Structures are given as C-alpha cells and as structure tokens.
Amino acid sequence: MFDLSADPAEIGARLGRDSLLSKRLEAMPGLRVPGCWDGFELSVRALLGQQISVTAATTLAGRLVRKFGTQISTERTLTHLFPSPAGLAEADISSIGLTRARGESIRALAGAVAAGQINFASVVNLAEFQSRLCELPGIGNWTAQYIAMRALGDPDAFPAGDLGLLRAASFRNERDLARWAERWRPWRAYAALYLWQASGDPDENPRPAATQRPAGKHSTAVA
C-alpha cells in the first residue's frame, strides 16, 4: 500500500542521472508509488477517471458506491462498501451519469473479475495480465499500465500515452516518450510519479492523451 519496500537511494541513483528528472529528484527525493487496498476498486476508479478531473471522478465514484454498494452502519462516516464485481457486472452503470460505452467497460471488467478471468490476487506474469486486461472493451495500454503501477506494484509500469507525462516531459507523442523512458528501466513507475508531480494541477487525473480506443483496436495514444 505505501511502497515501503522501495529503496529511494537505488531508484534515485538511476533516475537522477537523467536530464529530465535530476532537478525533480533533488526537489522531491524519496517519492514512493502509492498502492491500493483492492485491485478491482482501483481499476474501476481508473476507468471512471478517464478524460475527467479528480473532482468529477470522485463524484462519480461516490454515486457508484451509493447506488450499487453494500450499505453498512458504523460509528463514523463510512456508509457503504464498494460494489462487488458480480453486482457491477449486472448493474445499469450508465444511470450514474456515465456514457453507455464507459458503463459497459466497467461492466465487462466486473464480469471478467467475477468469472475469475481477471484475478488481482494471483498475478504471475505481468505482461500476460496486462494483455488480458487489454482484451476487455474500453481498456488499452494506458489503463493497463496504470493498473499495473497502482494495483500490482509494478515498479516499471509506464503509461507513456498519459497527457500529464507528455506535457511534463515536453514530448509531443507517446512513441517518443516511450523511447526516452527506456533509460529509466526498471524504475519507470517512479519516473512517472515525478513527472506527474511536476504537472502542477492537483485536480487533474492521470489520463490518456487521446480518446479511449474502441474495443479490440489499438491507436497511437490509448487509455
């Protein structure tokens, strides 16, 4: 969850040699990549947040949980548990204000998790897992890389098509940034975090630089 096993000295020694990152590491040494409590919830929130602000994505997540989650009673402010994969697989998710296509993407992910086709708890091969994710409608390389970074703790995950990364690194396209980022292996996730920190807008989600690809097709910049 808190990436406590990371070695900031080792990571900094590698990334600090790069002209794009050296000053950022000096200003903010020791950044760690935050994880999550639940891979499915993180993945749904990643889909909810595509192409919109943090504020808007948080609003949608709240609607989703209130409408489809399990209501509970606590002494504090927690009122609902996040919806189960089986529950979301059958839900009319577009009713919370999503486009039908985005709702179907979440339903497809939920169905795959409910059926055991996607299992965040037993990932052996990260590349194969990301490939299975990308077979689902509405999920492309950006989303798969972001999930690998935040839900699976992959230190080398890198969503090169992310708009904030492209802006912070002053690259015009995903291909050129991906080529430059090869020198950051095996710590590209940390490089992404430093670039996001430099993007400067606290209300801007990590997001793809172009519209989400249609299911089964790839584009030069995908979500």
Task: Give residue spans per PLM region.
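HhH-family (HhH-GPD) DNA N-glycosylase catalytic core used in base-excision repair
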Residues: 1-223
